[in-house]
């Protein structure tokens, strides 16, 4: 594939082979991430004389298929972006007038969003590399739109699929790959290129490639700022100073003087005289013009010449001619002639470039002078006291005359410029005529020399060997010239071949992508038509049911009502089946059998429970679609990741608020991994690379006391999740590996029931090693010591802290529980131990985990209180302990609105200081330790008394008693 050197394939193991691979290669590191497409390019920007190429740092974002550009690699916010998904590319062919051996142009065009952006690479090879890489990225992104399911809840952003077990679901394609022939043709048309030093992340450490116009842009910008500052002094109401003047420096010593009041009076008098003979002096402009352009012999050195002179001195410092006035010419003699010729050629090119820049600057000066003339003249005619008392028609006539004068002046200047250009063209043509005459003379001499050689050969035939032509003969010149022309034509031919290959590949790709887009549109139309038909069918059935409900009910005759209800129930309990995926668009289902996390949405056994679960799933779907219509959260995440394209993620209030609102499904793997790495960086720095593989190898070689309990709990972890439902599931093997590795890392805990559920949730979005470090984060960083030990000391302490917080934040509900003697910590104990796994619906569970992995265990207290506050009124209506306790066992599954729950957790419960939780933990820790010590003493006394009791005897059988 083109540009394969810049991309690395993602590795990833799955199933049982992953464990064996990790065991066989304990030193193997994690899979390498694909290399980013980034580097320096020059972008054509600006307007007018300031238009030119500016060096920019470009970074490709595969999530949105955007090509962002920055001023430098260190910038956090991009200057803009190009949408590559709907872009097409082109570049110009070789220049036929170019000299043979010269470097062809390396600029190309990106046509996107109705605009054309011109980019320039340092050389032709890098231009080809960028074009093929951008083509490849566009191809992968657009084809990935076909590789995901149409349900938006199961469709991560193309190019940014999550990792972990949920990533495996994205490989279930609705369509087979439709572009096999197009892919084969693309490979044939591809041109192998190798990235240079200015591509890739290593290019950020190198200086940006410069271009000769950089100093001119800077000088023009500075010059424009000075002009703007000088113009700001032209405000009415200020006193006139005759010595004040505005000077424009060009290559000629022109000076722009402000008009004095005397000049204005003279101009008004002259205009009044011209009113009598308006046609008399139509072409005369000098007498009435309020500005004086004159030579200023006393002016010092001009700033523009200083800039150009310093630029020449910097670039011609190696010129030997600048050293030779002292009489020692040894330096220039020692230099080779080729080097001297190259220097002279480069200086000539710089001189031509400077001449072009000088002409553009002169044009800018002319436009600015004309603008200043017009503005100042209008100012004096509108605000000057000299115009007081002058009739209105006279002033209008003066304005008309002034406009005529300005127009004639502009026309005169334009004609002058045209005259200069024509004169320059005449001079160029004369020089070309001279060159052609020289070539004609040389050809005549060559023909004459050939005639002489032919005559000599004919005269001396048979008398001896033919005379050889000297190498310096004029006949060699046409041969060399023909050879150069042949080389140039060969270069052009090769360039046209490459361009033809590229354009053919571009046309092929655009045609294939267009066909894919048309097919997606047809499928979506079919899906929406089917949904509309199903909606009409359901509405019809409900209208029939409502009509039947109006009729009197007969106890003996069931009537058609029961049949309609039975049919509606049967239709409602249907779920999406994966046996016939080709009919997914023909018969769409609103609720699938599994959600995006792999949890079963509808149970298999109880029909009544199935109906309740189906209603809950439909409510969740409705909430999700409603939230999706408000795209503010998704847009905020996209904007945040756009600002981090050029830098690493960092903790900030903005990121905290985004995570609290919930991480989108397509970004959760990336953000979770970043959170885990941030909390475990100190552990990883103190361990050898491949720490997880080493522990896993040890667990496979040696027997661990915890391994038996781990095996017993594997299938009991998340039986309602398809990734852990059977022994052959991929998640079971990964879960075993992580738990065994952790049991060897932390022998004090080994294994505790509850750790398996923590790892199972982490594995849904993380790979094995990252899930291992996630467990380390929870057990060794977030939770207090002895949280998962045999005594569960830390867990018991947190329940007492939570009881204190309940009495403070929810006093009515706490008093209600105390009144009916309901110990709600029996319910909340499991919430804290496994961080709400199997306690809330999956959408809310993962939003809780988002904040938990970023902020720590304080989030558990927030959400536990928020769950009770969410249903506070319903709980207060219950008036007996049995109904309260029964409601507490399932009420969390009835909470579906994650946005409301998050608002309660991080809004209504504030303030929520972490220091308060730490102080109460320390207070209750001593009390619980004292109670456990007393219980242990009582237990030891009981065992001691039982062992030393004289009444203790050996048990005998009934037969022995009979005998």
Curated annotation (Swiss-Prot):
It is found in: Early endosome. The keyword DNA damage does not apply. Keywords: Coiled coil, Disease variant, Endosome, GTPase activation, Phosphoprotein. Residues 34-139 form the PH domain. InterPro entries: PH-like_dom_sf, PH_domain, Rab-GAP-TBC_dom, Rab-GAP_TBC_sf, Rab_GAP_TBC_domain. It comes from the Eukaryota. It is linked to Neurodevelopmental disorder with seizures and gingival overgrowth: An autosomal recessive disorder with variable clinical manifestations including delayed development, hypotonia, seizures, gingival hypertrophy associated with a prominent mandible or cherubism in the first years of life. Some patients have early normal development followed by developmental regression. Additional variable features are coarse facial features, optic atrophy, sensorineural hearing loss, and ataxia. Brain imaging may show cerebellar or cerebral atrophy and enlarged ventricles. This is TBC1 domain family member 2B. It comes from Homo sapiens.
């Amino acid at each position: 594939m083109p540009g394969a050197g810049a991309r690395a394939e993602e590795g990833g193991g799955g199933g049982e082979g992953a464990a064996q691979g990790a065991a066989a290669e304990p030193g193997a590191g994690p899979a390498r991430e694909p290399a980013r497409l980034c580097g320096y390019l020059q972008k054509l920007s600006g307007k007018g004389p300031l238009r030119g190429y500016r060096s920019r740092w470009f970074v490709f974002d595969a999530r949105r298929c955007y090509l962002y550009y920055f001023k430098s690699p260190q910038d956090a916010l991009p200057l803009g972006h190009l949408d590559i998904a709907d872009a097409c590319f082109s570049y110009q062919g070789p220049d036929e007038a170019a000299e043979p051996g010269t470097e062809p142009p390396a600029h190309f065009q990106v046509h996107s969003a109705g605009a054309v952006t011109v980019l320039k690479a340092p050389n032709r090879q890098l231009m080809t590399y960028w074009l093929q890489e951008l083509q490849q990225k566009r191809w992968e992104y657009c084809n990935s739109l076909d590789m995901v399911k149409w349900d938006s809840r199961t469709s991560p952003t193309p190019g940014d699929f999550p990792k972990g077990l949920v990533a495996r679901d994205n490989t279930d394609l609705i369509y087979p790959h439709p572009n096999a022939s197009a892919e084969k043709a693309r490979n044939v048309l591809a041109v192998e290129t190798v990235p240079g030093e200015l591509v890739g992340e290593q290019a950020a450490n190198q200086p940006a490639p410069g271009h000769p116009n950089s100093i001119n842009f800077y000088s023009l910008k500075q010059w424009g700022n000075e002009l703007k500052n000088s113009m700001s002094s032209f405000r009415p109401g200020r006193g006139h100073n005759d010595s004040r003047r505005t000077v424009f420096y060009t290559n000629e010593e022109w000076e722009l003087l402000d008009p004095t009041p005397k000049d204005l009076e003279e101009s008004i008098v002259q205009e009044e005289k011209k009113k009598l003979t308006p046609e008399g002096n139509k072409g005369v402009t000098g007498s009435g013009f309020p500005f004086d352009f004159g030579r200023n012999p006393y002016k010092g050195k001009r700033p523009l010449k200083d800039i150009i002179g310093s630029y020449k001195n910097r670039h011609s410092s190696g010129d030997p001619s600048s050293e030779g006035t002292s009489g020692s010419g040894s330096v220039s003699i020692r230099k080779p002639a080729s080097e001297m010729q190259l220097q002279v050629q480069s200086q000539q090119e710089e001189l031509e470039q400077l001449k072009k820049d000088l002409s553009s600057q002169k044009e800018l000066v002319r436009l600015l002078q004309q603008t200043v003339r017009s503005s100042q003249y209008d100012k004096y005619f509108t605000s000057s006291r000299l115009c007081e008392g002058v009739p209105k028609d006279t002033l209008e006539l003066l304005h008309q005359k002034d406009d005529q004068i300005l127009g004639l002046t502009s026309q005169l200047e334009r004609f002058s410029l045209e005259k200069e250009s024509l004169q320059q063209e005449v001079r160029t043509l004369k020089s070309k005529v001279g060159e052609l005459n020289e070539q004609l003379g040389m050809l005549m001499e060559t023909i004459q020399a050939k005639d002489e050689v032919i005559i000599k050969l004919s005269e001396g035939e048979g008398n001896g060997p033919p005379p050889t032509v000297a190498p310096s003969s004029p006949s060699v010149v046409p041969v060399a010239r023909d050879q150069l022309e042949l080389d140039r034509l060969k270069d052009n031919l090769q360039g046209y071949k490459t361009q033809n290959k590229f354009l053919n590949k571009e046309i092929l790709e655009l045609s294939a992508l267009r066909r894919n887009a048309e097919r997606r549109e047809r499928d979506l139309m079919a899906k929406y038509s089917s949904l509309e038909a199903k909606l009409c069918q359901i509405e019809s059935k409900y209208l029939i049911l409502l009509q039947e409900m109006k009729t009197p009910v007969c106890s003996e005759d069931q009537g058609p009502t029961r049949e309609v209800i039975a049919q509606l129930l049967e239709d409602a309990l249907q779920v999406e089946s994966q046996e016939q995926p080709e009919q997914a668009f023909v018969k769409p289902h609103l609720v699938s059998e599994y959600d995006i996390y792999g949890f079963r949405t509808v149970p298999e056994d109880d029909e009544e429970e199935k109906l309740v679960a189906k209603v809950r799933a439909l409510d969740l779907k409705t909430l999700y679609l409603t939230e999706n219509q408000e795209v503010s959260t998704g847009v905020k995440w996209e904007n945040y990741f756009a600002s981090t394209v050029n830098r690493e993620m960092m903790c900030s209030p903005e990121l905290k608020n985004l995570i609290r609102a919930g991480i989108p499904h397509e970004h959760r793997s990336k953000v979770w991994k970043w959170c885990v790495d941030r909390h475990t960086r100190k552990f990883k720095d103190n361990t050898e690379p491949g720490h997880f593989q080493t522990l896993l190898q040890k667990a496979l070689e040696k027997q661990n006391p915890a391994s038996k309990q781990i095996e017993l709990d594997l299938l009991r972890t998340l039986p309602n999740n398809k990734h852990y439902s059977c022994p052959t599931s991929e998640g079971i093997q990964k879960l075993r590996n992580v738990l065994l590795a952790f049991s060897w890392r932390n022998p004090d805990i080994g294994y505790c029931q509850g750790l398996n559920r923590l790892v199972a949730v982490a594995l849904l979005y993380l790979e094995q090693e990252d899930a291992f470090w996630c467990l380390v984060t929870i057990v060794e960083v977030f939770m207090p010591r002895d949280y998962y030990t045999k005594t569960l000391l830390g867990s018991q302490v947190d329940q007492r802290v939570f009881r204190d917080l309940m009495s403070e934040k929810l006093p009515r509900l706490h008093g209600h529980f105390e009144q009916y003697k309901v110990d709600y910590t029996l319910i909340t104990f499991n919430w804290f131990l496994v961080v709400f796994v199997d306690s809330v619906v999956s959408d809310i569970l993962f939003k809780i985990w988002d904040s938990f992995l970023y902020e720590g265990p304080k989030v558990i207290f927030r959400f536990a209180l928020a769950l009770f506050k969410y249903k506070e009124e319903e709980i207060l209506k219950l008036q007996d302990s049995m109904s309260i306790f029964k409601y507490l066992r399932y009420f969390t599954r009835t909470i579906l609105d994650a946005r409301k729950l998050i608002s309660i957790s991080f809004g209504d419960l504030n303030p929520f200081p972490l220091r308060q939780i730490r102080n109460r933990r320390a207070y209750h820790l001593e009390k619980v330790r004292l109670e456990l010590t007393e219980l242990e003493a009582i237990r030891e006394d009981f065992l001691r008394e039982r062992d030393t009791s004289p009444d203790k005897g050996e048990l005998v059988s009934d037969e022995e008693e009979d005998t």
